[in-house]
Amino acid sequence: MSDTAEKLDYSTTLYLPQTDFPMRAGLPQKEPETVKRWQDMGLYKKLRASAAGREKFVLHDGPPYANGNIHIGHALNKILKDVITRSFQMRGFDANYVPGWDCHGLPIEWKIEEAYRARGKNKDEVPVNEFRKECRDFAAGWIKVQSEEFKRLGIEGDFENPYTTMNFHAEARIAGELLKIARSGQLYRGSKPIMWSVVERTALAEAEVEYHDVESDMIWVKFPVKDAAPALSGVSVVIWTTTPWTIPGNRAIAFSSRVEYGLFEVESAQNDFGPQTGEKLIFARKLADEAAAKAKLTFKFVRDVKSEELAAITCAHPLASLGYDFPVPLLDGDHVTDDAGTGFVHTAPSHGREDFDAWTNSVRTLEARGIDTKIPFPVDDAGFYTEDAPGFGPSAEGGAARVMDDNGKKGDANERVIKALIAANNLFARGRLKHSYPHSWRSKKPVIFRNTPQWFVYMDKELGDGTTLRSRSLDAIDQTRFVPASGQNRLRAMIEGRPDWVLSRQRSWGVPIAVFADEQGEVLVDEAVNARILEAFEAEGADAWFAEGAKERFLGNDHDHAKWQQVMDILDVWFDSGCTHTFTLEDRPDMKWPADVYLEGSDQHRGWFHSSLLESCATRGRAPYNAVVTHGFTMDEQGRKQSKSLGNVVAPQDVMKESGADILRLWVMTTDYWEDQRLGKAIIQTNIDAYRKLRNTVRWMLGTLAHDNGEEIAYADLPELEKLVLHRLSELDKVVRDGYDAFDFKKITRALIDFANVELSAFYFDIRKDTLYCDAPSSLKRRASLSVIAKLFDCLVTWLAPMLPFTTEEAWLSRYPDAESVHLAQFPEIPAEWKNDALEAKWEKIRKVRTVVTGALEVERREKRIGSSLEAAPVVHIADSDLLAALSGQDFAEICITSAITVVGDEGPADGFRLQEVAKVVVEQKLAEGVKCARSWRITTDVGSDPQYPDVSARDAAALRELAALK
């Protein structure tokens, strides 16, 4: 052995990976430093400057509520938005993200009132604008907190200039939008039964309620027939209801001409109250036996009762003796079924939408019958009966009965009504029922339906162009892209079935309904007055409306101050958020209208998507968005709703502190986000494991590229294997771009992770490690591989950058220390020549044979006949001409990572290794012949052929000589 060989440490002659990019990520420590670096370097402004003049892409941010720390739903939502905007920015668009906040409304009022109570302060004694200032300050504080939390998630946007609904300009624009609606005749004051929160003392929209199971009283009530054909004289119609307190509001009974009804006679009675033997009652035939059982009666069927007979009936109110001395007609209603109850529906137009519709749709018929069609106001805003409920109102013995108290608990109304029905001998039966009932989503307390004067927007009024707000909205839905597609039908069904839009709320913290109205509800339309209002709001905010002397200031001297009343209700906060497109998309020069995308949770079909659609269609005739993307809710690992009581809440702050924001982001990217997702410790660990593999792939590339001198090898000079990798990059480029366009991030992450793990780490990198580590500096194969790995790195890191902004930034700066940020880069443009389907088809065959060889090697390893695949020199028997042809000219030993390999075109031995799915390939195992190379560890017969380096192969000896010459 020569002196050179004796002294040489071969490990120093290898091109082993070298990088400062650590295997251990340390994301919780590094990510905050990266956020600070981005802020210090002004990354957001650099992104805007780099995108100047490009086509705009706008994802309009649905505003979270400025109240409390962010939760996992916020994190999911913001990460999805961030990935979308980043992906468009890196594909040649100007994708500006402007975060926003919803600032008005009841939850903030509650917090301020809570603080008042703690200090013994009475809210009613506080000047309204002082109260509003405290609400404003509260919201501003939480905007600051949430901004920092969003930035910690890696969200990039204009946090220095967000939009807020309490900004003076925003308040002026919101008021201006209302005035547009008023000017077009779409705004009106009316009375309708609406959902009312007694606890919060305000009207609620459908979007502000959630449904919970409750147990309620249910009663069956007799309505004595007062006027009918002689054959039905002396009988009673029986209704069923789960809201006994609404009986004072009853004005009609609904039946259906599609239901079969019958007259029944009581044969026996075993009850303490209710019908007695001989009484005659009308029921839906299908439900009579069930009703009889509830009342402990036996019935005898007398005869059928036709719908024509029912339509001619007028009943007495069951509480007529208390002052309800008016006729109760029977009305044919489409909403009536014989699925439950009695087949008759108690109709209280003050307390239900269907009841209201049934009553108002029959006004002409009722008036022709001499029936008063005025709708009463039986319940006040505190849940007490009014004088419109004789026997239960303020003048009743014991005072006014109450439906619900200030804490959302059931009052005494049900029991007092039931006792009165028993006293009148008109209670048929009573019981308890568990059913779904609306609750306020804020207070979590039940709501009631009550008739109140409110401000509405017409859904079905003709708007002068042959359209209505409903028809415009439905047309707009048809022109909108929905992801998932099911969202279209969901929103369509809501618009088709919704009532007129209730805009008014009886609270203080919000944008006022800044109009003047007379006693009849007629709205003053005067452009000079409107201009004064909007000018004041722009300068002072909506507080100007509540300031002393506001009425005189805005009306001026042109109008009778006694005639015109200043409306002091505020707007539904959904109207606020429904107007964000005006003062964000239209008014900001860095945005555009309409937005390309609105993205929110699936509950926003009845919330922000809904209100934005209505507002924009009312004022502009189309939706403010081109596409609507929805995500589901985050459950725990068992699929249960996350709640503090279950102890299963996953806070994003905790995940970031323990694992890092990129882990949370990877979880979002790997879920079917449009459905409900699951999250917990095991799922987080799964994502940590996937992240580590991905990180190690990037780390290996960085280490290998430490030896890259930037040389780019011409495509024509590349070996087939490198061309195959570039073909796969070409295919992945389409998957990535199509995936980002379709908002299908799971498809992208699955494709990239599989590519990194299966095609790179377990195939291409494995095959090329020997070349990359051991070949001579001048080796074309080594240089070609480095050239391709450089392209792999650029593609993978930029493709992943929208999803994993922290990790990709770290990797990019490790590779390009002089670069500012990966996020200022663009996705690489892929040359058309990279796509090579014929080459892929050929290599599919090669890989098929390789699968059999690696399977055979695994058996040899398991049986401990070899330790490494380099100890093997298998014989591969192939009885398939296509497979054989594919291997022609290939260094198949290199591809299989063996020291040698022999390919034979025959059937092979019967006892050889084979796989069922590749039946015509048989592997016969043999050990490699020769000596193990001290440098590459391959076993070859030419070790010792070079006297200068007698313990290495000829290839390695040549490489060593070349390396020595370079020193």
Swiss-Prot record:
Pfam families in alphabetical order: Anticodon_1 (PF08264), tRNA-synt_1 (PF00133)
UniProt-annotated location(s): Cytoplasm
UniProt-listed Enzyme Commission number(s): 6.1.1.5
Residue window of motif 'KMSKS' region: 641-645
Gene Ontology cellular-component annotations: cytosol
Keyword Protein biosynthesis appears in the UniProt entry: yes
Domain of life the protein comes from: Bacteria
Predominant place of localization: cytoplasm
Known catalytic reactions: tRNA(Ile) + L-isoleucine + ATP = L-isoleucyl-tRNA(Ile) + AMP + diphosphate
A biological-process GO annotation: isoleucyl-tRNA aminoacylation
GO molecular function: aminoacyl-tRNA deacylase activity; ATP binding; isoleucine-tRNA ligase activity; tRNA binding
Keywords: Aminoacyl-tRNA synthetase, ATP-binding, Cytoplasm, Ligase, Nucleotide-binding, Protein biosynthesis
Binding site for L-isoleucyl-5'-AMP: E600
Domain notes: IleRS has two distinct active sites: one for aminoacylation and one for editing. The misactivated valine is translocated from the active site to the editing site, which sterically excludes the correctly activated isoleucine. The single editing site contains two valyl binding pockets, one specific for each substrate (Val-AMP or Val-tRNA(Ile)).
HAMAP family per UniProt: Ile_tRNA_synth_type1
Subunit structure: Monomer.
Entry's family note: Belongs to the class-I aminoacyl-tRNA synthetase family. IleS type 1 subfamily.
Role of this protein: Catalyzes the attachment of isoleucine to tRNA(Ile). As IleRS can inadvertently accommodate and process structurally similar amino acids such as valine, to avoid such errors it has two additional distinct tRNA(Ile)-dependent editing activities. One activity is designated as 'pretransfer' editing and involves the hydrolysis of activated Val-AMP. The other activity is designated 'posttransfer' editing and involves deacylation of mischarged Val-tRNA(Ile).
Descriptive protein name: Isoleucine--tRNA ligase
